[in-house]
């Protein structure tokens, strides 16, 4: 039988030769070893896919006259964070026929989606939509890159403050969304893996038998612990666990969705297991883009009856359109960008905009595409004087290539080493009016309070064991640097999403209106001040090279700048932290009701981050999973 140890022994031998004979073996030899390792490991682990790309198995071509279209009880449009949950939970009832349609493919054999440290490799890749915002008028008039995965699944973990969900309940007029009622769905999906390195976490406060494994990454970068201790010394209290009734305020190591083998967990891997995909009443279609939902308007109230979808070839040729019927409901789960786009392409949206693109108006719904919000962020970078950052992940020398091979071996064989890191290993959540961090004698504390409650933070600093210009654009190869990402959790700026055309293959116009309000600039400047304070507080002083000469890619000089000068830097550098929400929001003036039914229609719901009426003071993926769990229960009770 073939053994992984054989692979290790042979590749380790290659590594030793490379180190011993650097003058005769090049970086290409090192790269070849890496490729060999990945090919062998992929061969050993690949599974036969149960996903469908032959659409005739689940639907019929629209062009075929006189055919009966395939029928399903529920059609779920979009296999992202929410869609996979819904498909799994609804198909638990063998009497319900469920069809899930995803524009991308499976993430299970895409290495960057499974290796924790490699998520940035998905950006600007074939698995990314390559989206850009409209020019941001208050942020240098730049178009901002918005990475959006084109794969089944997706996840991250820090849920927000309890008062965030109480605020949702008030907006929705439904107390089932309050923390006391909604948090049970967080516990339902969680499977916490206790870690002896972190005894402060109370397992009784976490879910233990859900499908989504959650815990701490196997690798801890030395700067991670230094950041936590420096944050405490700067005045931010230690938090035993961000994901309890105490909320997110404080500093600690970040939990993430990761299993015991150090593989990233997504809702595809957690919910669409082999056993689930084997259910005869569930089919999952991939590489198919839904162009519109169709309605029966004969009763006067539009009722969703079917969806149309197609695919593109590698030569960009659009294939035939297929149609499938939904006898009960269509659930749109395309995310904050694609869900409103699909609704508008289907005739549900602002009438004037639909008519501009010659789309027949099924329902004038002005709120579709409105209320677009995102967590804006700013990176600051410092030289790491310990030489322990992850700069070798982009090899620039024989030595860094050897280090990368070493780390690939450690990760693929034992699930350890830097590749098991989630990069942003430690975090600090705090308020911009914290009088310990920002003493009244030094700071003007009359900032607008945009938080959901007194214990909810509005700023987050993420400590990263490496540095980039933005997203996945690397710094100079030989520069050993780390970065702090300052995230504005409760912006007051709101934008919108509009159609560019009636073509479903054309990206919509996305304008988050970053930094439109003075509040957002002022709070981010204060966040930069806090990050600088942490970077220059012991024991971070053992990591930060505070005496480094000025470098155009480093930010040691920021401490000497005025607030006005920092505001200019904030406007220049602001980027997305990948959390858009709100474009199909709940609420009195929103798109959906508290059971996520599209108002003014029948048989149509939306379930993803687009229904969130406000941003949480954490990361939204956990709330999306819980929302899908909640909706699955609502639907199963409705059709029991």
Predicted region positions:
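N-terminal redox-cofactor-binding region of secreted/periplasmic oxidoreductases
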Residues: 2-640
